[in-house]
Structure formats: structure tokens, C-alpha cells
């Protein structure tokens, strides 16, 4: 399996944490331990992650301590990541954002002052739109995508826009209506302008769309 394929599989696994409840505790906590280590290298061993039940069907998280470890609890991986972000903000006075991080953390992390329990507002926390994918994300590599996925989870997002494979849907629909391969790809906009194609504002701009891009989108699914 080549590196690109491994990255695709990892992308799908991480993306799936936004959509599924936490049934496999070990797998789900492992994903968030890895997130913690990416955001704050060297600190993941100071945390203990626990899966808890939802609060009357609503996502919930807790931040607690036992004198030795920082205890993060949540009913989903996203809830656990949200607890991690809350702890960084309000106990460590740290900050993680798109434009820069303030992560001046002591070697030994401080204990929370008291147990904090919070319900996450909204069953579905939606993020991104078509334009996001073409303005910036069309050119992201795996490292940048992983950073964005971590940021989404830490900010409670559980329903990001998922456009992977949409190019293939358009392409195969056009073939169904007797477009040739060349005609179909010429009709489709290039990756940097796909959003406006999907919103039916333009066609063909920046194209023809390479078949390799269409095939790549199918591998992601």
C-alpha cells in the first residue's frame, strides 16, 4: 500500500469520528489520544480518556482530574476532543486557532479546579460550504487536512461538508446522458472552481477536469 493510499484510509477513519457514536471505546479514545499528541506533543500521557453515556440523547463532555491525570470524558470522540479544547482554553489559558496557537504549557499540566460537565448545543454541528473546498482546500495536502480535522473535532463539529466523489457523480451522470468522456470532462470545472460548478454558477471553467482527479475522488470513498 503506497503512502497516498494510507493517507486516504486514515482520512476516512478520522472523518468517520464526526459521524458515529462512540461504540468502540478503545478505538475512539486511541484516535483522540493521537489528536492530543499532534496538538500538544509529549502531553498525551498526562490524560485519561473515558467514554460516557449521552445526556438525554444529547452529546456531553466532562473535564475532571484525579490529582495525577487530566480526565476527559465524552460520549463520542468529538465530545472528547471538545473536552480537550475546553481544558486548554479555560484551565491552561491556551489557544488553538487557524491563524496560530498559544500553547505555552508547563511540563506538568495543571489540574482542573473542579469537575466541569457541559452539554453540546445542537444535535448536528455543521461546518464548511462548497466555496471552502475550492478557495483553499483544493490545494491542501494530508498534513493540512489532518490539522483541519483536529480543529473541527476540538470545536464540536460532527457534520462537515463531504464533497469527495461529487466530481465522479457529475461525470457519470453526463456519461449517462450520452456525453463522451472528453465532452463530460470539458463540461466540468477544474478543482479550483468546482464549488461554483456544484452550485450551478458556471461550467467548464479551469477544465477540462483530468480523469485522474475523478478517479482519485472515488478511491477516497
Sequence positions of predicted segments:
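Bacterial N-terminal signal peptides that target proteins for export
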Residues: 2-11
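Surface-exposed cap/linker segments adjacent to membranes
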Residues: 24-25, 38-40
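Hydrophobic h-region of N-terminal signal peptides that target proteins for export
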Residues: 15-23
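Feature activates predominantly on carbohydrate-active enzymes
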Residues: 34-35, 41, 52-56, 65-219
Amino acid at each position: 500500500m503506497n503512502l497516498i493510499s494510507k493517507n486516504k484510509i486514515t482520512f476516512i477513519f478520522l472523518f468517520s469520528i464526526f459521524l458515529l457514536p462512540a461504540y468502540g471505546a478503545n478505538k475512539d479514545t486511541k484516535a483522540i489520544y493521537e489528536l492530543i499528541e499532534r496538538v500538544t506533543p509529549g502531553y498525551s500521557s498526562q490524560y485519561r480518556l473515558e467514554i460516557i453515556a449521552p445526556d438525554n440523547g444529547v452529546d456531553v463532555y466532562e473535564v475532571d482530574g484525579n490529582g495525577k491525570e487530566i480526565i476527559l470524558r465524552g460520549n463520542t470522540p468529538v465530545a472528547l476532543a471538545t473536552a480537550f479544547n475546553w481544558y486548554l482554553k479555560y484551565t491552561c489559558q491556551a489557544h488553538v486557532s487557524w491563524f496560530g496557537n498559544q500553547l505555552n504549557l508547563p511540563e506538568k499540566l495543571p489540574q482542573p479546579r473542579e469537575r466541569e460537565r457541559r452539554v453540546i448545543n445542537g444535535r448536528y454541528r455543521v461546518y464548511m460550504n462548497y466555496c471552502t473546498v475550492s478557495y483553499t482546500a483544493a490545494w491542501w495536502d494530508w498534513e493540512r487536512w489532518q490539522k483541519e480535522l483536529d480543529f473541527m473535532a476540538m470545536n464540536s463539529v460532527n457534520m462537515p461538508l463531504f464533497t469527495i466523489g461529487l466530481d465522479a457523480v457529475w461525470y457519470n451522470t453526463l456519461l449517462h446522458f450520452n456525453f463522451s468522456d472528453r465532452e463530460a470532462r470539458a463540461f466540468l470545472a477544474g478543482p479550483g472552481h468546482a464549488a461554483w460548478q456544484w452550485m450551478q454558477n458556471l461550467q467548464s471553467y479551469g477544465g477540462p477536469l483530468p480523469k485522474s482527479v475523478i478517479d482519485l475522488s472515488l478511491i477516497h470513498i
